[in-house]
Swiss-Prot record:
Function: Functions in the N-end rule pathway of protein degradation where it conjugates Leu, Phe and, less efficiently, Met from aminoacyl-tRNAs to the N-termini of proteins containing an N-terminal arginine or lysine.
Domain of life where this protein originates: Bacteria
GO CC annotations, alphabetized: cytoplasm
Main location: cytoplasm
Gene Ontology MF: a single term: leucyl-tRNA--protein transferase activity
Recorded family membership: Belongs to the L/F-transferase family.
Biological process terms in GO annotation: protein catabolic process
Catalyses which reaction(s): N-terminal L-lysyl-[protein] + L-leucyl-tRNA(Leu) = N-terminal L-leucyl-L-lysyl-[protein] + tRNA(Leu) + H(+); N-terminal L-arginyl-[protein] + L-leucyl-tRNA(Leu) = N-terminal L-leucyl-L-arginyl-[protein] + tRNA(Leu) + H(+); L-phenylalanyl-tRNA(Phe) + an N-terminal L-alpha-aminoacyl-[protein] = an N-terminal L-phenylalanyl-L-alpha-aminoacyl-[protein] + tRNA(Phe)
Record-listed E.C. numbers: 2.3.2.6
Keyword list, A-Z: Acyltransferase, Cytoplasm, Transferase
Protein name as it appears in the record: Leucyl/phenylalanyl-tRNA--protein transferase
Class in the EC hierarchy, top level: transferase
Pfam families for this protein: Leu_Phe_trans (PF03588)
Amino acid sequence: MTLSADLLLHAYANGVFPMAESRDDPEVFWVDPKRRGILPLDGFRISRSLAKRLRRDDYSISVNRDFAGVVQGCADREETWINGEIFDRYQELHHDGFAHSLEVWMDDALVGGVYGVSLGGAFFGESMFSRRRDASKIALAYLVDRLNAGGYILCDTQFITPHLASLGGREISRAAYRRRLAEALDQPGDFISPALPSPQVLLQRRTQTS
């Protein structure tokens, strides 16, 4: 199957997403889980240890500075669903303003990040990676803050892992997901405009919304 940016956007709007069996497999298939993972934007959990890590402020955050580097970081593992076709099409979505990344830097090195697709008030988190301890958690904390600031009402994680569950992620039924998706697509979401907060402001906002 040949992907296109328009086909991808149509698929996301209908609740399905693409995957490949491996990096070297050229084929792409559609996934529509019976149980869908979401990260409630008012229920993101920041543990004491993560709050302490955020306050250390020995990192910097950027948005859309190195989208390709984040996708490559996510694909740089023994088993990955990101093949060449998927990589290229998400670069196209990024160029068109529908796919975004959030990066974590330490000592001028990209050490973590997350990327996904934005449609209306829905953000479809595709993947994340970490090369330093807690870097992906830091990325998610800033992502959730950004989604809240930008007016998003749905953060789709596709599946739930123990890592996501520890941060507040949960599963809902396909029918419940479709209802939330339809509502989110009717809402405006702005990924670009919100300013990056300081760690102190991020933690204060989280306390106010939890």
